[in-house]
Amino acid sequence: RGQRNLLGAEKSATNADWYCEQRQTYQLPDEPNMFFGVPINTREVFGVLHIKGFIFDDTVLYSGASINNVYLQQQDKYRYDRYQKIHNAALADSMVNFINDYLLDFSAVHPLDVANRPRTKEIRSAIKAYRKNLSAHAEYQLESAVGFSDVLTISPLFGLGASGNELNQVIEDLFLQVQEKLVICTPYFNFPRTLRSKLARLLEQGKRVEIIVGDKVANDFYIPPEQPFKMAGALPYLYESNLRRFCEKFDAYIKNGHLTVRLWKDGDNTYHLKGVWVDNQYILLTGNNLNPRAWRLDAENGLLIHDPKQELLSQAEKELSHIRQHTKVLQDYSELEELTQYPEPVQKLLKKFARIKADKLVKMIL
């Protein structure tokens, strides 16, 4: 990703070019390199590095955000995300060790802040071996969950691929732990089948589910109808179609108050929140979008907080009240637009996708 432009954007200098330029501008020595490209697959569409976290000595700043102008609102718009600051030496060490022990395998991982970067085809076999090794062996090395009191703990988790994925398994287990209420944040409404079935079971059992998702105009791929259309601009409508079908299917639970669906929208700002809250007992911090791509293709991580004595309850409630601030609760699935109400170029593309069965493929990889 560091070697390409934004999806749908004009070709221009990439992040990797900028890293190289900065090294020259400041006349830095050739060693050590500071920026590395981690290839999770030989093609970006089939997997990228999506793990999160910044480590400063013994402090971990965990966020789904990137460090750039829009997330940090350096100009007019902002992209809304979560930021958690955790001071713990053991946790910080485990995250740094993970990078050194597993990510920085120099057979496949190369510096980006140099002019001569290897082409994918030159390291294709190394990339395949690298992904296989990460999927089979990579994990955060801790003897036990990191303790903050006699019971409050945090466990770092990693996952890659459809089988043997620890993070996926923990997320599925969290859904099974719900006694009263599950809260989910995701920017892209596109749950994998296993989570859809678990949500259905929770509702059938009389449990409460709250889903906080971005309105289509709060999606980072959204293009206003008055602007020239690009293919990536159809994605927010595809996600809204998913949401409409889901809400129609579970309309009775929306009506009886067991299912709450909130749409986040604040002007032309965008929404990028992910996370899971279970019964004031568990909080999952993650960059995982809870979609098929995260489930099968990308390298993902997360921090699972277990808080059986509700020591973090006031902080968790405060964060959720902030998240809900710019949301509207759906009363009926018909409040969401349907295909015939979409701009003509979007209608044409989504109809074409459906006709050639490409919509299912798109949902698997985006």
Predicted regions: what they are:
Residues L199-A200, P236-S241, T286:
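A post-motif C-terminal structural segment
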Residues R1, V170-Q177, T194-V209:
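Catalytic-core regions built around general acid/base machinery
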Residues R1-V178, V217-D279, W295:
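HKD-type phospholipase D/PLD-like phosphodiesterase module
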